[in-house]
């Protein structure tokens, strides 16, 4: 068996072992969030609104905390949109 075949065999073995361990872990997590009810459970899984702070690049105006985005020169001399 050459080196390449040995490496492939080890990768396959590691993948199989990882899948077995992941299956066992998933069973342990099945009831992890059952103690939370109603609004408390919604807060855990609700995505909090995030905004881009001023001075950071902004792809869309609605993602800026200030709700405004203008073209400004960056450190490389290129013009990019940044949150105000």
Swiss-Prot record:
Its main location: secreted. The record marks 57, 74, 82 as: Critical for insecticidal activity. It comes from the Eukaryota. It holds the Pfam family Omega-toxin. SUPFAM superfamilies: omega toxin-like (SSF57059). Keywords: Calcium channel impairing toxin, Cleavage on pair of basic residues, Disulfide bond, Ion channel impairing toxin, Knottin, Secreted, Signal, Toxin, Voltage-gated calcium channel impairing toxin. InterPro entries: Omega-atracotox (IPR009415), Omega-atracotox_CS (IPR018071). Residues 1-22 form the signal peptide. It is found in: Secreted. Expressed by the venom gland. One of its GO terms (biological process) is defense response. One of its GO terms (cellular component) is extracellular region. One of its GO terms (molecular function) is calcium channel inhibitor activity. Residues 23-45 form a propeptide. PROSITE patterns: OMEGA_ACTX_1. Disulfide bonds join 51-65, 58-69, 64-83. Several paralogs that code for the same precursor are shown in this entry, whereas other paralogs are shown in AC S0F211, AC S0F205, AC S0F1N1, AC S0F212. Inhibits insect, but not mammalian, voltage-gated calcium channels (Cav). Belongs to the neurotoxin 08 (Shiva) family. 01 (omega toxin) subfamily. The presence of a 'disulfide through disulfide knot' structurally defines this protein as a knottin. This is Omega-hexatoxin-Hvn1b.
